[in-house]
Amino acid sequence: MSASMPTPMMVHLFAALAALLLGAWQLLAARRGARHRMVGYLWLLAMLVTSLSSFRLESGLGIAWLAGFSPIHALSVFTMISLAMALFHARARDFRRHRRWIAGAYAGLVAAGVVAAALPGRALHAMLFVELPRIVVAAAAQQF
């Protein structure tokens, strides 16, 4: 990551990456037992940090609704509601509803990441399509 990247953005990206990886693990691993609960709580924490840290960021889309917040921030609010509902249903042992809320939150995470990577002007897009190619080219040039 760029040394000039603001701390809230680094926190947001790190938490989102952790949530993406932990969520993939949860989807592929067995769904019962202490390990599932432990990884689930870590995923929930990463998702919560991702959502909360988004309020320290501008949308980067040039649009704002209220007090600098945009539709992307509304997704963060919905994500936090989804997390609360998923936890509620897991504790109530209603695993069908738990899975639905979790699947929705994870799909939102993936969709937000795809949008952030695809839209020019966003930090993730710049990292993947500007900074990373520069690093690869510079590293390759040093080999020759």
Regions picked out by a protein language model, each given a short descriptive name:
Residues 1-144:
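Alpha-helical membrane insertion/targeting regions
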